[in-house]
């Protein structure tokens, strides 16, 4: 994520990843304030056996796109709501990538963080049967939680 303030949203992705049993790491990496940290991180992602990157950022939100430019791993971008433009600035920064630098862009805020974790788990489930089983259980539980009739 781009800053400490993004954690109030991105911790929701952690919760889902924990429930589904996807190993993860959480770091603060700002594309603007810590560019060397960003380059160094991107350089070791494959070596460190990372399969998917979830990058949450607010404002100009260049982190997901820059990480995508520096690695061939799937990058999922979560726009974080900003005070001035309600996250529209973040969304447009992440979704409007030039051809050849893909970022899977999710919804602004909490729903985006949760769906990014589920999407990352879906990607990992293509080669990890434990994650696949846990993800299927999570989805089944979610389906069962929906009432058939209103109270």
Where does each model-flagged region fall?
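Short glycine/serine/threonine-rich phosphate/pyrophosphate-binding segments
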Residues: 6-11, 35-38, 57-66, 85-88, ...
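Accessory alpha-helical/coil subdomains and C-terminal extensions
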Residues: 142-151
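Glycine-rich phosphate-binding loop
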Residues: 41-79, 83
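A charged, well-structured terminal subsegment
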Residues: 109-143
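N-terminal beta-loop-helix "entrance" segment that forms/cooperates
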Residues: 26-47
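Glycine-rich phosphate/diphosphate-binding loop of Rossmann-like nucleotide-binding domains
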Residues: 1-33
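Short, acidic/small-residue loops that bind anionic groups at enzyme active sites
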Residues: 70-107, 132-138
